[in-house]
Amino acid sequence: MAIRRIDAAGPRARDRPRRWLEPRPLARRAAARAVGRFSPALVGLGLGLLALGPGLAPGFVLSYDMVFVPSPPFSALTFGLSGGPPRAVPSDAVVAALSRLMPADAVQKLILLLIFVLACSGAAALVAVRGRPDAMADSPDMPRRPGTAVADMPLAARLAAGVCYAWNPFVAERLIIGQWALLLGYAGLPWVLRSLCRGGERIRLGRLAAALVPAAVGGVFALAVTALVALPAAVSRGGRRERARRLATVVMLLGAFSLPWLIPALLIPVHTDSRGVDAFAARADTPFGAAGSLLMLGGSWNAQTVPRGYGGLASVVWLAVVLAALAGYALLARPQRCCRGLGVGALAGLVIAVAGAAAPGRAALTDLVRAWPGFAVLRDGQQYLAPLALAEAVGLGVAVAWIVGAAKAAVAGDHPPGRGTTAAIRVPAALGVLGMLAPVLLLPGLAWGAAGRLHSAHYPASWQQARRIIDGDQHPGAALVLPWAAYRRYPWNGEEALYEPWPRLLRRRVIWNDALQVGQQTVAAENPDAGRLAPIVSSSGPLMARLREAGIRYVIVDAGPLLARRTSGPAARAWLPGASVLLADRDLVVYRLP
């Protein structure tokens, strides 16, 4: 008689699958958390690579105010002590310091990519700081408990918010005009708001200080945009005493980070032209007027910085997306107070921008600038749309979460259990992907280096040689740069407009014309040296004696007809009699005065 082997675990144990063959729940959850945590940053990196395109090649991306130079020196200009408003403080000093560790063009690429990574991941992290709208409670794609963490928010919703914040007309126009320092503060804005809204009422000083670092590096305008949100967020939580404590903490940090540019601004008188109010006023770049363009995050004062293809039929669809995002913020995000203070900052920024676009607002702002030059920070009002961009990104994110959840519930309800599973997955997934891709599809002009406008360029070898000659001279005296204009269009930079690079290239004091021509308007120079030299440069006849009296040691001609007409011969001798031509080629002529 055969004896049957008895399994001590019972007959059912043989029917159960072996646990080591099953996927491990802990590993699965860890992988899901990793995907949810790092996806926004990776998507931001992908957006940065797509936006920069040819600009990622070796060399420098040089466009309007985006002036990076090889091995930038520390000079008086770096610290805002050369005259004029210290707009590039401390951003130039940070770049100069980082360029001691790696090539300056690599520093530039890392900063530009960091802007997209911080912006996308920050907006994604902000979408669900706490709570969820009641309207989303029945969504099967949302957590059932009353509090929710960022990791519980649908990934599609977080990515939609991140993509919208990192890829929009505001980012495109500010990137083309070269205001990377402002965009650095823009990228850090959601992290500042998150540090003020997350956790208890008491501010964690270290976390807030770390979140403010991008704005601190960006300087005055980056900090001004950040303050527009940080101050109302500080007083939006706690009782009266706690609100006062929070406000004092935020003001203290903002003040401390403002010292690098505030000190030179107080030490050296700042001169501003009130005509800049009209020159820098917002302009319509869509069929919906200046106010509509601003609501859609466009409206830059410089018409040359509008992305190619923007403003046509795609702008109509983009307006619909913006209105849906604003509705999502007002109806879904704001009731849960997940981004306290953001609505106030967004509204204040929009009011500042619209005021500059209207005649009464421009008149009032002109009077303010005449009364105190510090109000000149409000001339370019479109830059204060940064909080509105964040509000629209958050609104789009929660709207996508609501739509995806509602679609999943509707599809699942239309099919019996066990059927329609594919549709229940594909339809919400398609809606989520569409929400993520909408900003990119509607603004293709930002892709591939803004349609080729942002590309890499190399400074000519003669420029490096001229720098060695001029900085190696121990005799005192400034360098005068001609032609007498603020912007250049160098052939070696593809004829793209670029702000004069020589002040950042030389350690010696450089005098150039920083007056700005906008259409038929001229905004007067802000550097007192430029105002002093303007009558001399514009006069006819020999300039040698007057330039020497003005303290000029070198004259640099780097563009225009002066290169061909005054390099040598009788014309050059009559213009600067006795001057030595140290270097002359098709890109540059350098004169040294005796």
For each predicted feature, which ranges?
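Membrane-embedded helix bundles of polyisoprenyl
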Residues: G44, C120-L126, V150, P154-G238, ...
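Periplasmic/ER-lumenal interhelical loops and adjacent helix-loop junctions
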Residues: T78-F79, V250-A330, G381-Q382
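Membrane-helix boundary/interfacial segments in multi-pass membrane proteins
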Residues: V171-L183, L347-G395, W402-V411, P416
